C-alpha cells in the first residue's frame, strides 16, 4: 500500500512511501520473492531517476502442512458427534497452501504444533461480511476438541504427545531461526 504519496493534487510528490508484504509457501520462496521485490523497487527508482530507500523486516513464516494427528482427529469426531447437530469431520488437504499467515508458522519451523480448523462462520476472516452463524460449532465443539485433544495426547504419561515430539523434524533450531529472521533485517539506500 502507498502510505505516503504527496500532499497536493497535480504535483509530483517528493517522497512516496510504499509498504508491502512478501508471502510464500516455504522459506526459500520467501527469500526469492523478497529479493525480487527489492529489485523491482530499485529498478523503478532507477527508471525515473529517484533515490530508493529499502528497509526490510521479517514477517511470518508459512504454516507447515502435515497429515492429521490421529488423536486430534479422534477428538474432533467425538466432539462433533456429541453435539446437538451432526457435524462432518474432514481431513484438510495437506497439499493446499494458504496465503494467510500467523506466528503458528514460525513456531512450526522450530517445534511441533498441532492445529485444526472449525466452522460456524461465514465469509473470510478479515472481511466485512464475517459473521458467526453457528455458536455451537464455533465455540462449544471447538472447546471440546481442544479439551479432548489435550486429554488424548496427555493420558498414559503423555505417551502420544511424546511420540509427536520424537517424530518431529524441525526446519530450524532456535538459534538458526533467529539467524534466519535476523538476515532479513536490512536497510539500503541507492542514490542516482
What are the residue ranges of the model-derived segments?
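Zn-dependent metallopeptidase/amidohydrolase metal-coordination segment
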Residues: 74-76, 82-144, 148-149, 153-191
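Basic/polar N-terminal segments that are highly enriched at the extreme N-terminus
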Residues: 7, 191-192
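Midchain, well-structured core segments that form catalytic/ion-binding scaffolds
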Residues: 1-79, 95-105
